[in-house]
Structure formats: C-alpha cells, structure tokens
Amino acid sequence: MKNIDKVIVHCTATPEDRHTTVEDVRRWHLDRGWSDIGYHFLVYLDGTVHEGRSLDVQGAHCRGQNKNSIGIAYVG
C-alpha cells in the first residue's frame, strides 16, 4: 500500500433524493474518458460505505493531491 498522508472528502453534487451508486459514478467518470471511478470510496445516502477504486491504485479525485491520498465522496 502506498504512503497515505491525507484523506480528501468530496460530494457527488447529485440531488439528495436520488439514489446514486458506485456504478453510476463509475459510468459518469468513464464517459468522460477516465480509466475508472476516481474515488476510493463512496458513502451512500443511508451512510453505508462502498469501495470504488482499489486502494492499491492512485485516485483521480484532486489534481496535484492524488499520489498520497484517499478520495472519499458522499452522495448528495
């Protein structure tokens, strides 16, 4: 595992009443030419945590900060 020195929290900027899944976000990122979902974890509206990108792979969630960070996004 890489040397993690920060956790970066994002929101999906989706409607709060819309059920959004890891696959929804993955599809959105792939449609924009990314290699996979950019976040390592996604927190659903009910508070459950779901894995996105593997922790063994550098995230794609915050330009200039991806190398040593974990990206977590919450739906909403």
Which residues does each PLM region occupy?
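Peptidoglycan-targeting cell-wall enzymes and recognition modules
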Residues: 55-76
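Short, conserved "active-site rim" segments that organize catalytic pockets and cofactor/ligand binding
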Residues: 1-57, 66
